[in-house]
Amino acid sequence: MELINDFLNLTAPFFTFFGLCFFLPPFYFFKFLQSIFSTIFSENLYGKVVLITGASSGIGEQLAYEYACRGACLALTARRKNRLEEVAEIARELGSPNVVTVHADVSKPDDCRRIVDDTITHFGRLDHLVNNAGMTQISMFENIEDITRTKAVLDTNFWGSVYTTRAALPYLRQSNGKIVAMSSSAAWLTAPRMSFYNASKAALLSFFETMRIELGGDVHITIVTPGYIESELTQGKYFSGEGELIVNQDMRDVQVGPFPVASASGCAKSIVNGVCRKQRYVTEPSWFKVTYLWKVLCPELIEWGCRLLYMTGTGMSEDTALNKRIMDIPGVRSTLYPESIRTPEIKSD
C-alpha cells in the first residue's frame, strides 16, 4: 500500500500537468458551446413557483424583484414581518402574479418545514428553492467569551439551508426543479474576525457540492459565491461576538476595505440568469473568481495580504487597520461604495 502511494506521489503531478494541457482546451470549447446553448434555451420563469428565504433585505430582496419581473409566483420568508410585506407588495407591482409571505426563522427546523408546507399548500408545487437567509458575526475568536453565542451563525447560514432543502426536496424532484445555495467567496477568502461566518459558508459550499453528486440530474444546484455586495454587512450591520446586533460603519470599513461593492440588483440579475441557464456556480462580481486561483496556487500570499489589510498590532484599535486608513482617504469611500451603504441612517432592527 505504501509503495503504491509513493509511486502516485511521484507520478500524479506529472501526469496531471500534461493531462490538463491536453484536456482543458477541448473541455473549455465544449463549455463555451454549452453556454451558448443554455443562453438560447434559458428557462422561462413565467408561472414558476419560487421560494426565497431571507427575502426582507439585501440580495434576497432583489432576487424577489428579479423573479417578479420575470413573472414567477413567489413564496417569501424572513424574520422581519413588516419589511417582508413591503417586499411582497413591490414584487406584486413588478409583475409577480401571486405572492405569499411566511414569517419564519430558518434556524428552527419546525419553521423550515412550515415554510415549505405553506408554499405547497398555497401553490401546489415548487420549482426553485433559493436558500438565501444568513447572518454575519464579527469578532476576533479569542475575544468571544461564550462560544455558544456563535451557534446562531451556523444555525442560520448552514443548518437553515439544510433544513429547508430537506423539506423541499421531494417537491423539487417532482418538478425537476432547482436549488440556489447562497454561499460566499468567504468560503475560500477567509477574512479575520469572521471565523464562524467563513466556516458556515465553506460548509454550505461543500454540502451542496455533495448534494449535486447525490441528486444527479433530478434537481439542478447553482452555488452562488458573491464577493462584496450591497447588504447589511456592507452597510455596517452585524452581530457581535456576544450576539448583540450592532451598526458600526467604521468596522464595515475595516472588514470590507478598498474592495468595490457591487449592487444587489445586479447581483440578483446575474444569479437568476445563471439559474435559468443551469450554471453550476455564479460569482458576482465575476472578477472574484481569480481570488480562488490565488488561494489554490499561493495560499501564503492570501494569508499575508489578509493580515496586512485587516489586522492591527497587539492592543491597538481596529481603526488603525490598513483597510480603515485607506478608506479614510478623501474620495475613496464615495468611489468604491454605492450611496445606499454610505448613508448614516441604517435601520437597526
Swiss-Prot record:
GO biological process: steroid biosynthetic process
Localization terms from the record: Lipid droplet; Membrane
Expression sites by tissue: Expressed in the above-ground part of seedlings, especially in the vascular tissues. Also detected in the buds and silique pedicels. Highly induced in oil-accumulating tissues of maturing seeds.
Keywords recorded for this protein, A-Z: Lipid biosynthesis, Lipid droplet, Lipid metabolism, Membrane, NADP, Oxidoreductase, Signal-anchor, Steroid biosynthesis, Transmembrane, Transmembrane helix
Binding site for NADP(+): 54-80, 105, 197-201
Enzyme class: oxidoreductase
Transmembrane segments: 10-30
GO molecular-function terms, A-Z: cortisol dehydrogenase (NAD+) activity; estradiol 17-beta-dehydrogenase [NAD(P)+] activity
Database matches in PANTHER family: 11-BETA-HYDROXYSTEROID DEHYDROGENASE 1A-RELATED, RETINOL DEHYDROGENASE-RELATED
Role this protein plays: Catalyzes 11-beta, 17-beta-hydroxysteroid and reduces 17-beta-ketosteroids. Involved in regulating plant growth and development, probably promoting or mediating brassinosteroid effects. Plays a role during seed maturation.
Name of the protein described by the UniProt record: 11-beta-hydroxysteroid dehydrogenase 1A
Originating species: Arabidopsis thaliana
Species lineage: Eukaryota, Viridiplantae, Streptophyta, Embryophyta, Tracheophyta
